[in-house]
Amino acid sequence: YVQMVCMCSGEPIITAPVSTNDLSISIENIRKAITPKTKAIILNTPSNPSGRIICDDSIQQIAQIAIENDLIVITDEVYKTLLYDNAHFKSIVTCDKMKERTVVINSLSKEFCMTGWRLGYVAAPSELISVMTMFQENIAACAPLPSQYAAIEALRNSEKYSAGMIEEFTLRRNVLLEEVAKIKTITVDAPQGTFYAMLNIKSTGLKSEEFAYALLEKEQVAVVPGITYGDCCEDFIRIAFTLDIYKIKEGIQRLKRFVESL
């Protein structure tokens, strides 16, 4: 989001989470970040990279902040169906008086594994859609017709296609958590959604980027250093459990071997 805001000549302000140990969203920090120049709030729930879901109470508070300060809320909901342990997702657009000031972004890439199709959609007030349409028509015109038909099929039968995937990702997540629990110096909170997990590596004494590069070089395991997501995530690395269970186990075993060699 930072690069996109900068491309539009805006100034992105990143709000820190509750703490470096708790990556939950901080309502207090959001309030402090608001200035007379603020135009919008960008949300991502369930969150990449933390896998956290913004709870209903926090969603209501953010909606109130937006109304009080006359702000647009841009909500990225591409992981909203990838939920675990009966987790509940609430879209801010459903809050009172938010329909007229919310931009909902979604994609077929995550829910339907259609990353290569480059298909997504947005729902927003008509005046914003008009501006977006002008931009879209001059950049890409429209998605190819076969892609559009694929999207229609996916959206019309979303439950049929996503149910099996959610079941599989639940198994992968549980295997990941079980394997990481065997590593004494690394901890992980169970993600509520998405297919990402943030592993706390603070006790290893390495910075996240140093850790990630060394792990790749020595064990050929690729992770994302937490610093990529801001200073608040320096103590973490992000793992995506998008591979099959065998490869997840193998990857975590290599991670364990690497940590024990430090």
Where in this protein do the model-derived segments appear?
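PLP-dependent class I/II
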Residues: Y1-L262
